[in-house]
C-alpha cells in the first residue's frame, strides 16, 4: 500500500482547489498554493487511507474553507457526514 496519495491526484487537486481559493479569497497563485499546501486539509488529502479525493474538488475546497473559518477541517459538512 502506498504511503501517500498519487502525485497525479494531488496535482489535480492542487490546481483545482488553488484556483477556487484565488477566485473566492483574492490570493495570488503562489500565496494560495502555499496556504493550501500548509493546511491540515491538504495533509488529510495526501493520506491515502482517508480517501479524501472521493469528495471532488468542490468538497475539498469546502473542507479547506471550513478549516480556514473554524480552525478545523472536521467542521465541514462533508466530514460530519462520514
Give each language-model segment a name:
Residues 1-82:
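C-terminal alpha-helical interaction appendages
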Amino acid at each position: 500500500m502506498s504511503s501517500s496519495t498519487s502525485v497525479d491526484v494531488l496535482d489535480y487537486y492542487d490546481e483545482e482547489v488553488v484556483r477556487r481559493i484565488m477566485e473566492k479569497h483574492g490570493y495570488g497563485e503562489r500565496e494560495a498554493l502555499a496556504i493550501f499546501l500548509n493546511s491540515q486539509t491538504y495533509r488529510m488529502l495526501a493520506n491515502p487511507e482517508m480517501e479524501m479525493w472521493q469528495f471532488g474538488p468542490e468538497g475539498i475546497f469546502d473542507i479547506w474553507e471550513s478549516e480556514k473559518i473554524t480552525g478545523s477541517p472536521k467542521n465541514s459538512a462533508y466530514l460530519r457526514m462520514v
